A protein has these predicted regions:
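Beta-propeller-forming repeat regions
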Residues: 1-367
């Protein structure tokens, strides 16, 4: 694999989250990041969204998840952050001369990042913030009889057996670890087995592993080796390391997990995606450094950095460097980067936000 990308810097702004969706309803993807959206197809025209607050060198904006929340046919987005301690949605009113109204969904505690997962099997995504010092809660958009969003949410604090639901810890994943078709939650120090009814049933705690001090959001759950059971892929969000984990089950039903290194020499792998970036029909791991994830104190925080494609070979991962170097040359991917076909050529492109600026990487295919 020899993927080629054309890099274009859109902005020096230091927002760490970005999303790709059609803001103005013209059928063309746009880029949303922080206080601005960039109009496709050339992304040269910048429109203000407004309202994103700064806290030292951070912005309180750690996700950009598109959904029509109020059923008006326009895509809004879900965000939240550490300082505001709220999960929020920003309303796309269609009037792009004014700031987008912000609506608080819930007081959550400090949010590391939020992800959308299909938790209850109804075909619609729910929202799950990773709140290291607060409970695991699922937020479900309430829809009307026509299936349109109402702008209101149901709050589901999960019932747990084997541990209290009061402190998630840093890191969160979701996927089927039992093979029964239900999504389980993966935390830093174990996993929660899903009941048949996720909101009224009891989730069973399995303290099977210790994934480190601050695993990534998300922790990916994928069947890497085709053995019919899912493995875990995770980065160290504030230290060195990128790894995958598999397990064996003994005669008594006990799971024993084994860690396999992917990249122990790079650090601050905070966001990961599992997509087919080279078009061969098989997914690859896309990730990179979250530049200045903490202002100081993280392992490798002053190293040269970049983002990478890791290709599964059947036994391990091969690392392909897409961008790398010191500040001004290399580029990280922030806390919530975005992947989609921006230019309609059938290839997935990458939008990389971060404190080191906002850049687009147009996928040129295999060189």
């Amino acid at each position: 694999m020899a993927l080629s990308f054309h890099k274009r810097v859109l902005s020096a702004e230091r927002y760490e989250s970005a999303g790709i969706f059609d803001v103005n309803g013209d059928g063309i993807p746009d880029i949303v990041s922080g206080n601005y959206w960039y109009q496709g197809p050339d992304f040269k025209k910048q429109h203000k969204i407004g309202g994103v607050t700064a806290h030292d060198e951070y912005y309180d904006d750690f996700s950009t998840i598109a959904m029509d929340i109020n059923g008006d046919g326009r895509l809004d987005y879900i965000t939240g952050g550490w300082w505001g301690q709220t999960l929020r949605w920003r309303e796309n009113t269609g009037d792009y001369t004014k700031d987008w109204p912000e609506h608080i969904i819930a007081q959550t505690g400090s949010i590391e990042s939020t992800r959308a997962w299909e938790v209850d099997g109804d075909g619609e995504m729910e929202f799950v913030p990773n709140t290291p010092g607060a409970p695991l809660v699922v937020y479900k958009l309430i829809r009307d009889a026509q299936g349109k969003g109402t702008g209101k949410f149901a709050t589901h604090k999960l019932k747990l057996s084997g541990r209290e639901n009061k402190d998630q810890g840093h890191g969160l994943g979701f996927g089927d670890l039992t093979g029964n078709g239900r999504g389980d939650f993966i935390l830093r120090d174990g996993w929660l087995e899903a009941p048949a009814d996720p909101y009224n049933g009891t989730w069973i705690w399995h303290p099977d592993f210790d994934l480190g001090r601050a695993p990534s959001v998300p922790i990916l759950v994928v069947d890497l080796n085709g053995d019919g059971k899912n493995e875990l892929i995770l980065g160290e969000g504030h230290a060195y390391g990128l790894s995958w984990w598999d397990y064996r089950i003994d005669a008594a039903g006990k799971r024993t997990w084994t860690r396999h290194e992917i990249d122990p020499l790079s650090s601050q792998y905070h966001d990961l995606q599992w997509v087919d970036i080279d078009g061969d029909g098989k997914n690859e791991l896309i990730t990179g450094k979250r530049f200045r994830a903490h202002p100081q104190g993280d392992g490798g925080d002053k190293d040269p950095y970049g983002w990478y494609v890791f290709k599964w070979t059947g036994e391990s991962f091969a690392k392909h460097v897409i961008d790398f170097g010191p500040l001004g040359t290399g580029k990280g991917v922030g806390i919530h980067f975005a992947v989609a076909d921006l230019d309609g050529d059938g290839r997935l492109d990458v939008v990389a936000p971060g404190k080191d600026g906002l850049a687009v990487y147009f996928n040129q295919g295999n060189a």
